[in-house]
Amino acid sequence: MFELPKLDYSNLALSPIMSEQTLDLHHGKHHQTYITNLNNFIKGSDYEKLSLEDIIKKSSNEKKAGIFNNASQHWNHNLFWKCMKPNGGGNVPSKLESKIKEDFGSFEKFREEFINAGVTQFGSGWCWLSLKEDKLVVTKSPNAENPIIHNMKPILLSLIHI
C-alpha cells in the first residue's frame, strides 16, 4: 500500500513562495487523500501488486478513472515535492543545462516555453519538462494526466491551480 512521503523540508521552508497553510493543504490533505483513495480502490485487486507507474499506465488504458486519477496525482505530487526546495532557484545542474541548451537552443528559450505552457494551461493542471525518446520537451496536462501515459519521462514540473 502507498504512503504519504515525508518532505525533506519543514512546512515553513518554502515561504513566502508557498505558505505553511498552503503546503499543509496540498501535502497533508490533498496528497494524502489521493493516497487513501488509491489504496481503497486497489485493495484486493491485481493493481495492488503493481508499481505506481504501472498502475498509472494500466488504469489509463483501461479507463479506470478513479484508480488513474488518484495514482497519477500521487505520482505527480511526489515529483512536485522533489522539485521544490527551500531558497529554491540557483544553478541548473550542468548536465541538465547542457541538454536544455541542446534541445531548446538556450536556457532562456526553455524558460520562456515552460512559463508559456504554465500560463496558457486552462484550469488546474501541470506544466512538465520531460524526456521523450532522447529529447527534452515541454508539455502541459490537465488535472491528473501526466507524461508517463505518453511514454515520456518527467523530469520537472510546476503545479497550476486555478
Residue ranges, per PLM feature:
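Acidic, low-complexity proline/glycine-rich segments
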Residues: M1-S10
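A long-range scaffold signal marking pre-active-site subdomains of enzyme folds
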Residues: D8, G28, I35-N39
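Alpha-helical scaffold segments that form or flank carboxylate-/histidine-based iron centers
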Residues: P16-T33, L52-W75, V119, N143-N146, ...
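All-alpha RGS (Regulator of G-protein Signaling) helical domain and cognate RGS-like helical scaffolds
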Residues: N40-K49, K58-A71, N76, F80-K132, ...
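Conserved small/polar residues in nucleotide/adenosyl-binding loops
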Residues: I160-I162
